[in-house]
Amino acid sequence: MSDTSSNPAIVAQGAVRRLPRWVLLSFCLAYVLPGFVGRTPWKADDMEAFGFMLHLAQAMGPETISWLKPSLLGQADPLAALLPYWLGAWAIQLSPSAMPMDLAARLPFIGLLTLTLAATWYGVYALARTPAAQPVTFAFGGEARPADYARAIADGGLLALLACLGLARLSHEATPALAQLSFSTLLFFALANLPRKRIGAWVSAAIAIVGLALSGAPALAMILGIGGAFIMALDTHKPSALRARSVDVAWVLLICLATAALVSALGLWRWRVAYSHVLEIKAITRLLLWFTWPAWPTRISATATPSSSALWASMAPAITSPMAKMPGTLVR
């Protein structure tokens, strides 16, 4: 074998056979639609968000309220999440009169969850196409082709998201939390695709950072945007692309500055850690520990053996690649 890659993975072409697209799309449809269609708002957060949307959509005349300061029964939104409520209110206003208003309000959130799945697939695909992620090249051929290998990795990433997303977050509620998830994933897609499709990635990064800030998480938008720019600045694998990478970093930082100015003008800065949120983090951590049992103790025992030291040494360049660190930076 000719070891032209820093990744020690040995993958033959037969191991990355194409998963039929209709199967993958069927899984996605089966995940997205049942949770949104044929139900009424089912939890306090879901009902509260629908109340803000309905109030915005129906307010007129002397009862007109400010779309920049949504309120419900005289109480302002504690999350300061404008964009999710705007989307729901616009959907209610534009929907046919025969359509139930709660279903109409959920339509944009069906789109946001679909965007989450699509951005995940294309973001993972872009990272899997990078040289650091490619498997070993065989001396006499037969190794996995880059496009097929990346597609298999992206399929696995999307299926893993479908399997685990419900554990970490209720993704079928028309709330600002789903909008935050969607825009965070869109930012992951944008940063992963900057070396390949710059214009589309620039636009996606701008939409993601602004959308995340207007969905009740401006501080998180700044952390993810600046963190992503920092990771790109550390990437020295292609010195010839230094100038283009510098432009990309400057663009992301400029978006963050413009978004910070917009959020300041609207008075939307929020940064608080409530005790209930700490308890939620503890519960999620405990749940993930049990969900991954016994994979994580097996992984620890495998990496502790002497025979694994050479493997980890050969994997070091790929693992420490800035692009490989990007998904971990964007995990919330």
Predicted regions and their residues:
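Short, composition-biased linear "edge" segments at structural boundaries
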Residues: 313-323
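Membrane-integral, polyisoprenol-dependent glycosyltransferases
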Residues: 2-306, 313, 326, 331-332
